[in-house]
UniProtKB/Swiss-Prot annotation:
Record carries keyword Oxidoreductase: yes
InterPro entries: 2OG-Fe_dioxygenase (IPR018724), Il_dioxgen_HilB (IPR054987)
Reaction catalyzed: 3(1)-hydroxy-L-isoleucine + 2-oxoglutarate + O2 = (4S)-3(1),4-dihydroxy-L-isoleucine + succinate + CO2
High-level lineage: Bacteria, Pseudomonadati, Pseudomonadota, Gammaproteobacteria, Enterobacterales
UniProt keyword terms in alphabetical order: Dioxygenase, Iron, Metal-binding, Oxidoreductase, Vitamin C
Chain residues that bind Fe cation: 160, 162, 213
Protein source organism: Pantoea ananatis (strain AJ13355)
Keyword field contains Isomerase: no
Identification of the protein by name: 3(1)-hydroxy-L-isoleucine 4-dioxygenase
Molecular function GO labels: dioxygenase activity; L-ascorbic acid binding; metal ion binding
Top EC group: oxidoreductase
Signal sequence region: none
One Pfam family it belongs to: 2OG-Fe_Oxy_2
Amino acid sequence: MMEYATHLSRQGYAFIPGDYYRSTEAMQFSNKEDFLDELEELKKGYENLLLDPYSPGNRWRGYAQCKKNEKGELTFGKFNPYKQTKAFNPDTGDIIRDYPLLPEAITRNRLFQTLLHDDLSLVDAYESIGPVDSLTIGIHFFRYQATENEPAYSSPVWLHKDDEDVVFVHMINASPNMLGGDSLIASHPRSIDRVLRLEQLFDTLVVNHDKLHAVTPVGARENSGPAQRDIILITFQKNEEKTACPV
């Protein structure tokens, strides 16, 4: 974990392979069927998301916030209004938005809990934004759903920084007919430092405020039907800033 926290601190981002999460003790199941059952339950959460009514892009969304108390206990709900600033997202900044609350079947899911707890530990190891019990923690489920003639894309659609101090992007599923969905890292709007793709289950990109980032629009291969990209964003923000991540 420390190598990823160090890379985040020095480079402004880190790529964490999905194998890292799958090798953690919390993901060691007594048999493969139990793991697959948990994964199937997690994926079902994407069937109950809301098509984003606040901006175009064919993105389906669900949302929750998480609090960690001094005893280490986690609670989930909507504790603060979900709003972005115009400075970071000129498209929908300063608009309070509401999305379906993620159900307990998701927030109690063992695989989701493993991702969340590991992210909490990495932010603690990062040591640059304070203890996690002093931060606003956002959980965003996103489905990018594209067809041949209707791509799916983020907001803002190009290089940007987020309101949040640290953002994790976890890959859950990408359909084989998907085009695009590449992550870009940049030091300057006219200079791309790295292009990478989250492909395998739990492949993760984590970014801070030091670098710009973007994800390229998602499309579908010709005559292949809809293409989907399902991700989980887990965001961490100092409480003096009451805004949330533009995606």
